[in-house]
Amino acid sequence: CRVGISTSVSVDHATPAAFYAHQGQRSSYYNVGLDLIDANFDFYAGSDFLDPTNKKAAGSNSERLYTLVDKAGYTIARGYKDYQKKAKKSDKLILLQPATATDNSAIPYAIDRKKGDMTLTEITRAGINFLSKDLSKGFFLMVEGGKIDWACHSNDAATVFHEVMDMDNAIKVAYEFYEQHPDETLIVVTADHETGGIVLGKGPYTLNLQA
């Protein structure tokens, strides 16, 4: 079975990492990245790596994750157009944001999206197309709309709405594949957690233990 792990946030964030990493802290991003390579899955996608040079380790002289990824046989594609150019000739691939992106922690919110920004729909389509090159093996693909939760933390209803719609569009891509292969496709849509307490209003919540 071929395996793909994808998200709208960084490839080493908590939810994608839960499928391949074994670290004591979710913030050990460099080590999580090493686990990503060791897992040897076929396809990864997200905004980028959060700590590709191991900056958190004092005096570290660690090898860059991009170099290690290349040594492990992965092709790095920067954006969907670059993916389209490289996918056919690649055995294993990591899809990241275009090099022009200014924030490596996540792709832009759907409500703020500009022309050329990578979308969750593109990530989903890329994952399905890449993993289904050899259907005889079957595949598992995890797709996370990771910024729904972030927008809920900010109590930003408009942004939440657009992020959920973005996820809905990604599900439509998966459903298109299901319609072509109805007897062998299972789509599961779920939530690993939610912030809770989102209300109509303005601004994020605060924690006041003395109230």
Regions found by a protein language model. Name each.
Residues V3-S6:
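Short hydrophobic alpha-helical runs that function as membrane-insertion/retention elements
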Residues S10-A211:
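A post-motif C-terminal structural segment
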